[in-house]
């Protein structure tokens, strides 16, 4: 199932939210009706919060069913809210505050429950990232971009990446994430940073409201969401 929506008129949903196979985080500005629809499409419990007093949840955080990485600038109150949410939903998730110069973990890491791709900019933290997310990783960039997280969206079934990703990079991504499908595509009528525009897991996807019909078809194919 795929849903189109905006967050307060903004279509870059992946910048402001995080979705995994088992939980989701959304900005405080999202109305309850939209929240419930997204939870239904993705079939996950979710809560609304800030990270580092910011709505840029998807840019700053990265997570899967095993772990969640947040920047060291995340406040104590925000960490406690996350812990409470995880406990209330009986989710056994490793929560790690990582101190790094570049705090945009969501932009620099692409992960599912089988593997993760780490930007060269975070290569020194590879062991910590692997331990928290409990997956093996590959370090590198693709499409000549360091922002491997914001330029891709991955689930346990498939992955959609920047349209300039080459064939060797597609094979590399597929091997690391251990998915059946890796496709190139766009969202929001030509935006190449697909991770900034899409929230997805193996059960559904929520895409920016500007996403076209042909783009939705490609997203469905890449993430194996066609019924």
UniProtKB/Swiss-Prot annotation:
GO molecular function annotations of the record: ribosome binding; translation initiation factor activity
Membrane spanning stretches: none
Function per UniProt: Binds to the 50S ribosomal subunit and prevents its association with the 30S ribosomal subunit to form the 70S initiation complex.
Gene3D superfamilies per UniProt: L-arginine/glycine Amidinotransferase, Chain A
Keyword match Membrane: no
Key words of the record: Initiation factor, Protein biosynthesis
Presence of the UniProt keyword Protein biosynthesis in the record: yes
Family: Belongs to the eIF-6 family.
Protein's UniProt name: Translation initiation factor 6
Gene Ontology process terms (BP): cytosolic ribosome assembly
InterPro entries in UniProt: eIF6 (IPR002769)
